[in-house]
């Protein structure tokens, strides 16, 4: 419609003017006399990208953010100096680590909420356990390195690394205590009431014990291998696995000796280009030997007690189904036929692998008396990154990072709370663990086993009702995706609207004879990715396919390495990322030959190209064939892959070059309008708000009277509602069935209502150390819908938490006479209603032309 064209063009011109001012500060809109490609911004020198390509590798020096490398000096603006001065003022900022622990506490509150269905509560408890594992590996690991090397340097909240570790330890001890109190006192008893029973082989009936023993002898005994620990270094055990520590002493009767299969020796050499955590990683572990055999045939005097370890590994399932305990059969009533281990209405019984092995542990040690056998678990430091200045081969370097991570220091030790002092002291000494990060666990270690219970079949009444993703009314299954996008921009809200159109677009492109090229960035993908399959199929059919595969995506490195190799073999031109930066932008470009010429079809997103997590994460997709956006996307992609000087983009914001400046300019614009008596308003939704410069800019906007509403799911270092500093700032967090992952931003902009989606949170790593995109939402209907959706997040009174000035959170409840409102449920019902309305509903509203 004409209205849409007029509004779109007005938005473009405003974006173009801002881009000129952003890229060329001090120049008028027509003075482009600043050298292109040498854009200066706080934190860095001028940048050109240097990609790691699959065949040709660049060895030019580049900025590196690796652990242990001294950062380059940079010219700081007056604004930046102001922020650094403010950062020393502790009351201005919440500590990042404690803010994250507040987030995990909100997830734990979901597990503690009786209004949430039982298996969903179990799932939330499992999530808190998984979250805490990653926090310990990454954040605690990083702080321990800082405590050793950083001296007394303080973070923006005013704490040293040592002080942060002390605060984290205290908070985590309370968090873990609360997890297990909830498990013992509520969840396990409630599960038992619904006939989902966790069985301890030491306390069960003879019938269940017989079934447990059959499983142990048939499926477990032959797989596991104990390792002796007498007079030898502790074996190199994997992190996050469950292991059994066994305390032994000589028995009165010596039974037949069994020699368990020897474990493979481990090569602990560490590549010179990797940051090491301590000298302990250079120790060479000794393979386990027969527990009873003396070394080299020499006689040995056995000590009074010995220790052995049994790694349970990951081959065997941890949750072991057992027969259901059936009630006595009444006389004259025929028993019902059922599968003893199927989770039907009659129930489900299970034992944990560590309990099973502990009960029958004597079988591994004939001739020895077992004093005690207790499970333990270690967490290793995962904050090890490639020092890219010394890595000529990124793929090989990342494989070495994975190996080094496997051998890194232990940052946390979890032990069964009933372990005796000998086992406890032995483990602490063996792993050289900081005592404040030793956790005595009164219950099963590693609560992620509860995920398995959440997936039990036949327990639907204990889970949330299904909300199947809906097809967008803008997409007709009978027509090509190219036709649908040609009719106008399509915005999808996942997971309420299906991610299938994104997958379908790539699958159609792979076989369409008119498609000439496909360009794709992959950060995290699924295990059997249809998107990767489509890229390989396109390359095999002779299309020009380029994929940037970010090998440095933490904890997905191994999968991405595997995909990169497979795609190369299929003929895809693979780029391994950019030296010194992580490529985190979500963009796909398809170049298609059409009667009017070449057309670029582009997908921009806030989430990963992962069709599995797209059903669990709240994200935004925009599908467009807009010429200017397509041109910008191509220039962005060429800059990333071609080691060329980035050119100014008309509409897209790009980190680490211009995105920070653009965000600050947008906030500053609202500040200036408010000072001039106009209405200033900012609504922003993101995963984390950490950057002190952005926070300081928001404080200034608040002091000028700008209304600021922030929906921050996780870490928020800003203090809202502080008189004289942030009185007009409101921060809420939504924790519900879907993970809130979208980054969307609204600026009133004098009534123009500018909307953006982005791959970037407002964190230093996103703005300065990653390749990210900020994408304007130009289509008027999409812009209106996105703005209304953002506003809904501040009406939730069921699963919303409002942040307090001290960094704590209060759960929002309906006020008197206020109806309950749950934003995720509301969004899903809206999508269902839109789907029912259909694609060809008559226009019911009219939009007039308005002057810019």
Swiss-Prot record:
Coiled coil: none annotated. Residues 20-36 have a biased composition (Basic and acidic residues). It catalyses: [phosphate](n) + ATP = [phosphate](n+1) + ADP. Its cofactor is Mg(2+). Residues 58-67, 270-289 have a biased composition (Polar residues). Pfam families: PP_kinase (PF02503), PP_kinase_C (PF13090), PP_kinase_C_1 (PF17941), PP_kinase_N (PF13089). SUPFAM superfamilies: Phospholipase D/nuclease, PHP14-like, PPK N-terminal domain-like. Mg(2+) binds at residues 524, 554. The keyword Phosphoprotein applies. Keywords: ATP-binding, Kinase, Magnesium, Metal-binding, Nucleotide-binding, Phosphoprotein, Transferase. Residues 258-303 are annotated as: Insert. It comes from the Bacteria. PANTHER family: POLYPHOSPHATE KINASE (PTHR30218:SF0). Catalyzes the reversible transfer of the terminal phosphate of ATP to form a long-chain polyphosphate (polyP). This is Polyphosphate kinase. It comes from Rhodopirellula baltica (strain DSM 10527 / NCIMB 13988 / SH1). The gene is ppk.
């Amino acid at each position: 419609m004409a209205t849409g064209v007029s509004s779109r063009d007005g938005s473009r011109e405003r974006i173009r003017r801002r881009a000129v001012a952003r890229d060329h500060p001090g120049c008028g809109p027509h003075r482009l006399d600043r050298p292109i490609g040498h854009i200066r911004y706080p934190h860095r020198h001028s940048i050109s990208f240097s990609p790691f390509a699959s065949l040709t590798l660049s060895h030019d020096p580049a900025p590196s953010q690796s652990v242990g490398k001294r950062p380059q000096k940079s010219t700081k603006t007056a604004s930046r100096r102001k922020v650094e001065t403010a950062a020393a003022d502790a009351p201005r900022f919440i500590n990042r680590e404690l803010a994250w622990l507040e987030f995990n506490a909100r997830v734990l509150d979901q597990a503690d909420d009786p209004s949430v269905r039982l298996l969903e509560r179990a799932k939330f408890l499992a999530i808190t356990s998984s979250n805490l594992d990653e926090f310990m590996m990454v954040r605690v690991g990083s702080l321990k390195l800082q405590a050793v090397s950083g001296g007394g340097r303080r973070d923006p909240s005013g704490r040293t690394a040592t002080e942060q570790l002390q605060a984290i330890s205290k908070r985590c001890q309370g968090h873990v205590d609360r997890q297990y109190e909830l498990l013992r006192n509520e969840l396990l008893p409630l599960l038992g009431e619904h006939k989902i029973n966790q069985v301890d082989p030491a306390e069960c009936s003879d019938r269940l014990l017989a079934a447990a023993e059959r499983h142990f002898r048939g499926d477990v005994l032959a797989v596991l291998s104990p390792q002796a620990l007498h007079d030898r270094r502790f074996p190199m055990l994997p992190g996050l696995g469950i292991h059994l520590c066994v305390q032994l002493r000589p028995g009165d009767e010596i039974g037949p000796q069994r020699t368990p299969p020897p474990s493979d020796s481990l090569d602990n050499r560490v590549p010179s280009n990797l940051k090491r955590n301590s000298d302990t990683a250079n120790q060479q572990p000794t393979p386990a030997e027969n527990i009873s055999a003396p070394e080299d045939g020499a006689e040995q005097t056995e000590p009074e007690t010995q220790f052995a370890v049994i790694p349970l590994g990951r081959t065997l399932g941890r949750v072991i189904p057992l027969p259901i305990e059936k009630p006595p059969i009444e006389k004259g009533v025929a028993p019902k036929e059922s599968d003893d281990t199927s989770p039907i209405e009659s129930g489900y019984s299970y034992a944990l692998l560590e309990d099973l092995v502990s009960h029958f542990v004597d079988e591994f040690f004939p001739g020895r008396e077992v004093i005690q056998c207790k499970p333990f678990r270690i967490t290793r430091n995962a904050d090890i990154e490639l020092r890219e200045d010394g890595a000529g081969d990124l793929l090989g370097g990342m494989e070495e990072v994975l190996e080094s991570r496997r051998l890194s220091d232990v940052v946390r030790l979890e032990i069964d709370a009933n372990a005796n002092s000998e086992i406890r002291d032995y483990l602490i000494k063996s792993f050289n663990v900081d005592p404040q990060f030793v956790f005595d666990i009164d219950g099963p270690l590693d609560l992620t086993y509860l995920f398995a219970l959440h997936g039990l079949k036949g327990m639907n009444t204990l889970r949330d009702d299904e909300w199947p993703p809906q097809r967008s009314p803008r997409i007709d299954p009978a027509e090509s995706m190219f036709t649908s996008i040609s009719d106008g921009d399509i915005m999808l809200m996942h997971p309420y609207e299906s991610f299938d159109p994104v997958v379908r677009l790539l699958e159609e492109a792979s076989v369409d004879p008119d498609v000439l090229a496909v360009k794709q960035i992959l950060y995290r993908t699924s295990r059997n990715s249809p998107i990767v399959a489509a890229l390989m199929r396109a390359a095999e059919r002779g299309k020009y396919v380029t994929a940037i595969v970010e090998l440095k995506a933490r904890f997905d490195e191994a999968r991405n390495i595997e995909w990169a190799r497979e795609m190369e073999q299929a003929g895809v031109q693979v780029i391994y990322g950019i030296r010194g930066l992580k490529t985190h932008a979500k963009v796909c470009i398809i170049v298609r030959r059409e009667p009017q010429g070449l057309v670029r079809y582009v997908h921009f997103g806030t989430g990963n190209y992962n069709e599995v997590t797209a059903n669990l994460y709240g994200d935004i997709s925009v599908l467009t064939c807009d010429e200017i956006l397509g041109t910008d996307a191509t220039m962005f992609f060429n800059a990333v892959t071609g080691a060329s000087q980035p050119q100014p983009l008309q509409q897209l914001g790009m980190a680490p070059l211009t995105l920070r400046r653009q965000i600050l300019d947008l906030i500053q614009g609202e500040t200036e309008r408010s000072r001039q008596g106009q209405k200033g308003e900012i609504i922003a939704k993101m995963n984390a708000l950490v950057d002190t410069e952005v926070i300081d800019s928001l404080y200034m906007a608040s002091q000028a009277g700008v209304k600021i509403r922030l929906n921050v799911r996780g870490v928020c270092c800003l203090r809202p509602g502080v008189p004289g500093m942030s009185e007009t700032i409101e921060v809420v967090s939504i924790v519900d069935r879907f993970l809130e992952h979208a980054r969307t931003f609204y600026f009133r902009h004098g009534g123009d209502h500018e909307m953006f989606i982005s791959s970037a949170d407002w964190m230093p790593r996103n703005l300065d150390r990653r390749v990210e995109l900020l994408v304007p939402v130009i289509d008027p209907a999409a812009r209106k819908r996105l703005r209304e959706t953002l506003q809904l997040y501040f009406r939730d009174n069921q699963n919303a938490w409002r942040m307090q000035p001290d960094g704590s959170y209060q759960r929002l409840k309906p006020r008197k006479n206020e109806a309950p409102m749950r934003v995720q449920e509301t969004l899903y019902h809206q999508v269902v209603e839109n789907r029912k309305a259909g694609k060809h509903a008559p226009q019911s509203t009219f939009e007039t032309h308005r002057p810019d």
